[in-house]
Swiss-Prot record:
Gene expressing this chain: EIF2S1
Transmembrane segments: none
Subunit structure: Eukaryotic translation initiation factor 2 eIF2 is a heterotrimeric complex composed of an alpha (EIF2S1), a beta (EIF2S2) and a gamma (EIF2S3) chain. eIF2 is member of the 43S pre-initiation complex (43S PIC). eIF2 forms a complex with at least CELF1/CUGBP1, CALR, CALR3, EIF2S1, EIF2S2, HSP90B1 and HSPA5. Interaction with METAP2 protects EIF2S1 from inhibitory phosphorylation. Interacts with ABCF1. Associates with ribosomes. Interacts with DDX3X in an RNA-independent manner.
Family named by the database record: Belongs to the eIF-2-alpha family.
Lineage summary: Eukaryota, Metazoa, Chordata, Craniata, Vertebrata
Name the record gives this protein: Eukaryotic translation initiation factor 2 subunit 1
Pfam family, one: S1
GO molecular function: GTP binding; ribosome binding; RNA binding; translation initiation factor activity
């Protein structure tokens, strides 16, 4: 059975929050990631954000 764990009350992080992620794939527009501290929900980091 898969365990589910959340570290924060909110379902999603706020803008400008720093979170731990696992990169799932890299595409032309950016990277698809799993947000480790938010029950592994999927997110996307745009390429323009990665280059900052």
């Amino acid at each position: 059975p898969g365990l589910s764990c959340r570290f924060y009350q909110h379902k999603f992080p706020e803008v400008e929050d720093v979170v731990m992620v696992n990169v799932r794939s890299i595409a032309e527009m950016g990277a698809y990631v799993s947000l480790l501290e938010y029950n592994n929900i999927e997110g996307r980091i745009l390429l323009s954000e990665l280059s900052r």
